[in-house]
Amino acid sequence: PRSTPLYSSAASDVYKRQFPPLACDTHAHVCGPAARFPYWSERIYTPPDALLGDFRAMLDTIGCARAVLVQPSVYDTDNRAMLAALAQDPGRLRGVAVVPFDVDAAEIERLHAAGVRGVRCNIVDLKTGKGQLPLDALRSLAAKVKPCGWHVEFLMHVNEFPDLDRQLAHFPVPVVFGHLGYAPTSAGTSDAGFKALIRLMKDGAAWAKMTGPYRLTASSMPYPDTDAFASALVEAAPQQLIWGSDWPHVIVKTGMPNDGDLADLLIHWVPDAAVRNRILVDNPARLYGF
């Protein structure tokens, strides 16, 4: 596994004035300490330690009162590092776990009590099974987590799934897509999979995270080629959008972003303060149960 650069943090407190009270960063990962929480042997990268104290300092700097920790692929189904972080700040944090498909109700209830509000399916950062959506198993898992009011979060490239809305029709729980749908900007906003995502969002069945523009771009900060994707989502379904920093920016190839600049980018994408308030406060409160 290859290592990654150290994470960034926001450079100054100039960003604080732009985010409303109770703003939520809905996408970040804690990694390590590796000696206490060893990484999965089948991981495709090895992150530097990215610890809760540093993450909370970043949140304070950009003005986020709440946050959601998402289980990274380097831990597979071992959620201990994420759960340890949730236990340190249960009022501020929620979690999205990775669980085996045969997870039982008792484990789901244990995770719910710890602050978990969803499960993640990552079909990108894999050695095997990459790009394959195990729909039958996912429907079964979704039925198991539905009593807790959870959702299923996907890390996938929507441009690879032109029939996405039909494949996920009548899915038992809401679905959430990371990184604006994770279509490369070269696919364009007329891409069939991206349009299918928008249809799901308009129906209230799906959410999208305004995260990781550096994972889609063919450019560099401020990633101007991602603007059209963000605008299309904001115009179509602002009630189904949430924002996240994607801290600590693992396996980023375009240069380590500054988290304050990413906060500024949301202001650029969503200049209307009322809409921004929905994306930062109301929508995540509804999805994660703050």
Task: Indicate residue ranges for each PLM-predicted region.
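Hydrophobic faces of well-ordered beta-strands that scaffold small-molecule active sites
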Residues: C24-A28, A67-V70, R94-A97, V119-C121, ...
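Single conserved hydrophobic/aromatic residue that forms the stacking wall/gate
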Residues: P1-A11, Y15
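Alpha-helical scaffold segments that flank or form the walls of functional sites
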Residues: S41-D89, E109
